[in-house]
């Protein structure tokens, strides 16, 4: 592994081509249009075109799609010299993950007569699973090669589908916006991976692990898109009608309350009482994570705002006090602070969901109970039992995520060349790191590695 | 007020927390899901899911949401050293305003049995009201603290709701896209505030009150999003069916015509015949403002294009000739030129609306008259009277906006530190203003203030 | 033409105003609301509001709109000193083209009783035609004045409408996403224009014909938006129901497969095995172009992925090996490489469409055949004949595009001042090219021109 770039020339194309060819073969063998996308099937029955699920979900799908590719992609461009890697590797692993997720999710809970049926709902679910992988990417940002990222994605998507299957299909857990399945899972999986890949000499790349003025503005593009479209994210696969409507509304208020909490906490904890861009870029989003489970329930705007408010506070405190401890004591180098944005708020969201579920009554939900808690509506379990199932699901998710993160093992770029686009990308000349310097560093590293 | 930042550490958190806690308590006491978001209510009656208002309005809502947070936020990033403040304070006051607006608008015209009902329409209305506050923010950009901005937002939202109540509920004025209620109101309110806060020594910050190459590109993100989604803005709360469709179409053509007028006028008025980014970023949007009232009417594409064309011309002329006079003679320092983008085009839009209303006939509108002019359709007034009501509404809006702007009073950052992120934000080191210099300036200011 | 800017002061306003006034007059004489946007017409019949085409197509329209103004606009900002021109001229010619296209397309295939009917479908079609013009703009980027661009747009829109009329109306060709009508047409038209405008001394502007770090990030905004919303582009005007749904799905998978192929090919062909931003920004989109014709057909996800995979490979190979040859041997200076992104993938898309059409059977399409191949469904031609028509359409498109590009002739900025915003835009002082230097260059050029 004398030269990082030379090995890329061989390995990356091989990995990309082999993965894509496998995907194509499996799609050829297993994937079919579902009832609503198939010309013959759809026209076989009589109904109106506006009943096609496309019109209920496609606008939400596109909002989710923007969150995955622009939201996550640009949120991570805050690093001064890792903008190409942030948005570019995000693009690569997302494009891979959504294909692989279609297969894995289809395999575990979408088979119909030996075939995986696809349509707008499977597209949303694949994007959701991809979101989880991108959360983990945030934890290891700047310290991994694209090949490692693709490997990680392959494992993580698989385990995501397993966890999702256990929760949604076996246990009947409700988690429409994925506080558990997406955020908690992605965060703790990523934290475990970054722990295993601990780099004792990462401080050698410390000067690059920070932002410049314009990179912070690029990151704000990601933040704002995530913030705006989170109501679509949480409501994208809830039941039609009041459910989608209510989930969007709850998320909207949770995020608004979270934002005020974030600004207040940022000023109170920061140096000199100034606002810290890291908090604004991340903690203001915690409100969306924290109503991912309970958003479809009758949480009320009041309840949503309380949850969002708490999520903002917890998240800023995490950035200020917990992250340094995680790094120094537990050797967890969490580049984007996903523990503060997705980890803790995800756990909070799971708990809120469990409590809200346990308190559900027919008096509040009426016939709408069938949409939100079908098992409670048909009398097979009672509400408090549903709450217990929700709580159990959190534990299972944490277990699978942490164990799953342990599985992934591999080789990585030297500590001196982290957070640096020049390793994997052609960088415009004027801004490229001094070639000589780069070479020197490489040589040193090579010596170390080969010694 | 010796040190701006120290006072932020105390005041901003206190203000944020108190405001949010008050909001949460009021939401708990007053706010309820409406018929279409409530699980029990919606399921109590028989209807198809696609009849839920969510599917008629949510895509438009998301477009409006993008205009508020990305559109306004990035439009103002043109300042070279105030990008964090532009997008960051925009974020803060918008998140506050939309919550406060839900309460105020609900209080004035959304109470049902002592409760404020919320759903996608209230979300759009709250975003609309927020837009008005952000217009005013444009007038004072770079010269106010976040606490002042929150105070301004609190007053402005309240008065916005009062004005809206008088127009829409008492008088039966039509103003779906808010030429009067949003743009005229926001602009003249903001101009009055910036007049009261007149800074005689603002030329000390003159070198920062300008753009750099990349800040102009960031601002174009805001411009283009506002331009693209304006058809959704104007049509978001018009009646279902032909009304939403027609409004979007009219706005689309008005904006296209406005853009050509803007480029032509920019070249003719600018130094050396070159195009001026300030014009492109702002005047090209005036066409959307100017069909805010008449867009839902049978204005025809032809009429819409004439209105857009005029709006573009007026707006560029305003930037070139009127803004300097307003500053030098009337002491109105309008940072973003909101008078040219929202003020004059808003007044034009109100006049166009009044004339178009006065000319409405059953021959043109048919049974569609019920949607656009219900009072004319049921015979309680005739079209010319509706035109009169529209004109009166403009006068009322101007009066309330200007008087309202007078109410807001407070203390502000020193003239030497305007348009500077370093006052309120942690700025990445390499780009921070020289610490010594900042300190010196502060000390001087402190001396002045305490003397 | 002694001074470029002086002539702009006169010519650009005159051109903009005359064009817009002509447009307004023609709209006044010819354009009418269609059935679904007209208050009287829509209310004359009984139907539900959700049957209005607005709800089937407006969200797709807005996605297409974003692709046209943000997608194309920002994709071209990769040039270090031509960001204003990229996004600003894109804005100008798009705003003109969509109005002119409404007239031309209406004239050729939208007349009803002597009037052109407009609604959401005409808006989408106008945006599509605009897209074609912007593709041609990509070929000549940085080397043409705004007046030339408007002239080119005027001719190109007209010929686009002629070609579209021949294909869709006369021959019954299927091309919902425009592999032929939009991409192939726009690319070869633009390549012919740039060939005629060949600049032997363009290497004098060579140092500006490249990117800087942040300009590449701005370009990624354009890329990602194009990528995300391409499913909406291809499905925007297909039949309601399964057709829109299926087209979006096929495009989604084609793009994902294309992205992996692009990353692999970029690493294998680039210097040192590093990824090249030019490939990522462009080739990853070829998958959307290549399913523009067959996307609405029963191509299956499997077929879509194969097409996308091939498109990505072809596109990167084009950038690496074909573009340099086109420039050195054929004197085609293709600034954005539109031949690789739109030309070859467009031709591939046409071929895939012809083959897929030829293979269509009732067994696969059932009653859905009426939506996709109405002429095959009603028995007037058989599937293999439809395939032949598709192939013929490609030849016609290539012919009209290449001949059309020959027509456009004009005068242009000097070779030394290409790719430079300072010629047409007020550039913030600190970054403006040294005034003296600019003057010197101008003087030299003037001498040459006048000699």
UniProtKB/Swiss-Prot annotation, chains A, B, C:
Membrane spanning residue stretches: 12-32, 64-84, 88-108, 122-142, 152-172, 177-197, 217-237, 248-270, 275-295, 299-319, 341-361, 391-411
Residues with attached carbohydrate: 44
Pfam families: Ammonium_transp
Extracellular topological domain: 33-63, 109-121, 173-176, 238-247, 296-298, 362-390
Topology of this chain in the membrane: Multi-pass membrane protein
Keyword Membrane: yes
An example molecular function term from Gene Ontology annotations: ammonium channel activity
UniProt record, GO biological process: ammonium homeostasis
Zinc-finger keyword on record: no
Keyword annotations from UniProtKB, A to Z: Ammonia transport, Cell membrane, Cytoplasmic vesicle, Glycoprotein, Membrane, Transmembrane, Transmembrane helix, Transport
Record's subcellular location: Basolateral cell membrane; Cytoplasmic vesicle membrane
Cytoplasmic side stretches: 1-11, 85-87, 143-151, 198-216, 271-274, 320-340, 412-451
Superkingdom classification of source: Eukaryota
Protein function: Functions as an ammonia transporter. May play a role in the elimination of ammonia in the gill.
Family the entry assigns: Belongs to the ammonium transporter (TC 2.A.49) family. Rh subfamily.
Protein name as it appears in the record: Ammonium transporter Rh type B
Organism per entry: Tetraodon nigroviridis (Spotted green pufferfish)
């Amino acid at each position: 592994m004398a030269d990082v770039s030379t090995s890329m020339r061989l390995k990356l194309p091989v990995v990309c081509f082999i993965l894509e060819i496998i995907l194509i073969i499996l799609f050829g063998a297993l994937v079919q249009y579902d009832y609503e996308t198939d010309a013959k099937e759809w026209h076989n029955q009589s109904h109106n075109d506006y009943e096609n699920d496309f019109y209920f979900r496609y606008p939400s799908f596109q909002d989710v799609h923007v969150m995955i590719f622009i939201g996550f992609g640009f949120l991570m461009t805050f690093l001064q010299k890792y903008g190409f890697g942030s948005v570019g590797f995000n693009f690569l692993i997302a494009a891979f993950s959504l294909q692989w997720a279609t297969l894995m999710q289809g395999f575990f809970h979408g088979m119909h007569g030996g075939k995986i049926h696809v349509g707008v709902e499977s597209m949303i679910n694949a994007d959701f699973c991809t979101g989880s992988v991108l959360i983990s990417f945030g934890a290891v940002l700047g310290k991994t090669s694209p090949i490692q990222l693709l490997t990680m994605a392959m494992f993580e998507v698989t385990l995501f589908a397993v966890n999702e299957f256990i929760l949604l299909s076996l246990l009947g857990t409700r988690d429409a916006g994925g506080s558990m399945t997406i955020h908690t899972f992605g965060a703790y999986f990523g934290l475990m991976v970054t722990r295993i890949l601990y780099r004792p000499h990462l401080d050698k790349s410390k000067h690059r692990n920070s932002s410049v003025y314009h990179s912070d503005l690029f990151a704000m593009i990601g933040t704002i898109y995530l913030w705006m479209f989170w109501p679509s994210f949480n409501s994208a696969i809830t039941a039609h009608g009041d459910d989608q409507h209510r989930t969007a509304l709850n998320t909207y208020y949770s995020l608004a309350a979270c934002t005020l909490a974030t600004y207040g906490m940022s000023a109170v904890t920061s140096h000199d009482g100034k606002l810290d861009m890291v908090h604004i870029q991340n903690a203001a989003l915690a409100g969306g994570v924290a109503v991912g489970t309970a958003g479809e329930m009758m949480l009320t705007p009041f309840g949503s705002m309380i949850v969002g408010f708490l999520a903002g506070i917890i998240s800023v405190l995490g950035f200020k006090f917990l992250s340094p401890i995680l790094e120094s004591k537990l050797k967890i180098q969490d580049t984007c602070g996903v523990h503060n944005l997705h980890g803790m708020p995800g756990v909070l969201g799971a708990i809120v969901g469990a409590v809200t579920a346990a308190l559900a009554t027919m008096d509040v939900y009426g016939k709408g109970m069938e949409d939100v808690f079908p098992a409670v509506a048909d009398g097979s379990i009672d509400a408090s039992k549903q709450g217990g199932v929700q709580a159990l699901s959190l534990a299972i998710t944490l277990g699978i995520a942490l164990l799953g993160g342990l599985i992934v093992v591999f080789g990585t770029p030297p500590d001196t060349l982290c957070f640096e686009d020049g390793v994997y990308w052609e960088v415009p000349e004027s801004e490229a790191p001094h070639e000589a310097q780069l070479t020197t560093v490489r040589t040193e590293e090579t010596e170390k590695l080969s010694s």
